[in-house]
């Protein structure tokens, strides 16, 4: 019969001591754990408390807020199985040992780049016999009761496109761990992200409509400022007009997210990657192709959004009426005006956003990720805001040309220009600055959009039963 395992915390000024008492009938593979006397410096006590909270949450089967001996043993066995899977994924040579090169390669596959010196430092923290390699026993003994996070949890903490919605649809999809896919948590993340996007876009819709108006109507001779633009919209259609075109902008979130995710997973299989996570280049290629497929599928909704945003009060009775007017007057091809610059804008936006975000993520992980891969709210928001801003800045001229091409037929007397012709016309008549009309309201909405989508996403995760970070 198994007796109860006790640990007694003793607070001392310089260290905190934990005594583990061994049970005679404890399973062999767990005995060594209870022969330990751990001496933790006082500054590491917070790490211990975080680890204890995490263990109780993972192993508490009867949900009584406590971990009895049977639950603790079950947790250790289950955790050891997970550690075995992670060890095998790191052991690229299948020789039963992990060296510094394998650690560097595994993190590189995830998008985390470290030097050989840093990899050796990681090895030394686990290497007991000085061989500069880690076998299974060393790996298990170090991680079984250690508060550090494993590699898949970096994916969990650093989700990007799922969490942040700034109104653009060109981000590379997030990676999901095998556990998230097997348990069905992936679709809950997508639903939470979609709901967050709907709230975020609705809250920032006035700025988005102002951006469209400035992209199409603002010129060197017809300057339109932010205050003037808002005044003009309210005078023409009242406060309600500030949200004109927002309905279709929200409706397109669900089909676009679903198509992009399914396409991304299929493209990953087609390029022959069996890894749980892709490298940066593979992610960019797969994500850009998935984005192109999703955008092609819902592009008519993009045209409708632009036309509704530019429409006068009473011009259209709704989305269906707008679509009917466009089809009757201009034909089916009108629903794909501006398609080429839209597709061309995916690569610079997605590429720069991903590169900046991964660079910031790697920098934080290398400098500050000592006990946890969790960056906290402020770091996540800062990284998401900076990467989205850089991506938008790079692709903005293409976005402006796309919007003007979508709007051409709705402007009486406006010549129907090609993409290259419109570029030349803007530069000749307005200068290079003309390619950045509407940039100010576009940037103004980034911080509130990122903040709102994050808060709503976290709350929807709780509602949907997604494991909290």
From Swiss-Prot:
| Principal subcellular localization | mitochondrion
Q: SUPFAM superfamilies, from UniProt?
A: EF-hand, Mitochondrial carrier
Q: Which residues lie on this side of the membrane: Mitochondrial intermembrane?
A: 1-189, 265-287, 358-380, 458-469
Question: In this protein, which residues make up the domain named EF-hand?
Answer: 47-80, 78-113, 114-149
Q: Which Pfam families match?
A: EF-hand_7, Mito_carr
The membrane spanning regions, by residue number, are 190-207, 245-264, 288-301, 338-357, 381-398, 438-457
Q: Which GO terms describe its biological process?
A: ADP transport; ATP transport; left/right pattern formation
Q: Name one GO molecular function term.
A: calcium ion binding
User: What is the protein's name according to its record?
Assistant: Calcium-binding mitochondrial carrier protein SCaMC-2-B
């Amino acid at each position: 019969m198994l007796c109860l395992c006790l640990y007694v915390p003793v607070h001392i000024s310089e260290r905190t001591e934990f005594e583990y008492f061994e049970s005679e009938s404890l399973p062999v593979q767990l005995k060594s754990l209870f022969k330990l006397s751990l001496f933790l410096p006082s500054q590491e006590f917070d790490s211990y408390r975080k680890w204890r909270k995490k263990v109780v949450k993972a192993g508490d089967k009867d949900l009584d807020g406590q971990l009895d001996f049977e639950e603790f043993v079950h947790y250790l066995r289950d955790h050891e199985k997970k550690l075995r899977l992670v060890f095998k994924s790191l052991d690229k040579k299948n020789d039963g040992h992990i060296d510094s090169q394998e650690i560097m390669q595994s993190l590189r596959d995830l998008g985390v780049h470290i030097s050989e010196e840093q990899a050796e430092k990681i090895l030394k923290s686990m290497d007991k016999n000085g061989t500069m390699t880690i076998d299974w026993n060393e790996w298990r003994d170090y991680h079984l009761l250690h508060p550090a996070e494993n590699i898949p949890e970096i994916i969990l903490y650093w989700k990007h496109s799922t969490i942040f919605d700034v109104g653009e649809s060109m981000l590379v999809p997030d990676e999901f761990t095998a556990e998230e896919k097997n348990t069905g948590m992936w679709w809950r993340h997508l639903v939470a992200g979609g709901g967050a996007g709907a709230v975020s876009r609705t809250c920032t819709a006035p700025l988005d409509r102002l951006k469209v108006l400035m992209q199409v109507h603002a010129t060197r001779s017809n300057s339109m400022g932010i205050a003037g633009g808002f005044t003009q919209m309210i005078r023409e259609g009242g406060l309600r007009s500030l949200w004109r075109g927002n309905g279709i902008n929200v409706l397109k979130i669900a089909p676009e997210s679903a198509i992009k995710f399914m396409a991304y997973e299929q493209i990953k299989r087609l390029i022959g990657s069996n890894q749980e996570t892709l490298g940066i280049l593979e992610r960019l290629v797969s994500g850009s192709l998935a984005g192109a497929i999703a955008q092609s599928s819902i592009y008519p909704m993009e045209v409708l959004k632009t036309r509704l945003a530019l429409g006068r009060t009473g011009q259209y009775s709704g989305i269906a009426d707008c679509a009917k007017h466009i089809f009757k007057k201009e034909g089916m091809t009108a629903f794909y005006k501006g398609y080429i610059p839209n597709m061309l804008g995916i690569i610079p936006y997605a590429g720069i956003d991903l590169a900046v975000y991964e660079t910031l993520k790697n920098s934080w992980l290398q400098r500050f990720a000592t006990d946890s891969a969790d960056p906290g709210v402020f770091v996540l928001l800062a990284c998401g805001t900076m990467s989205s801003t850089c991506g938008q800045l790079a692709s903005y001229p293409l976005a402006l040309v796309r919007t003007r091409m979508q709007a051409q037929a709705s402007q009486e007397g406006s010549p129907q220009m090609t993409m290259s012709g419109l570029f030349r016309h803007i530069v000749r008549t307005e200068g290079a600055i003309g390619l950045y009309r509407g940039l100010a309201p576009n940037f103004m909405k980034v911080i509130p959009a990122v903040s709102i989508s994050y808060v709503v996403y976290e709350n929807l995760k709780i509602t949907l039963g997604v494991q909290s970070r």
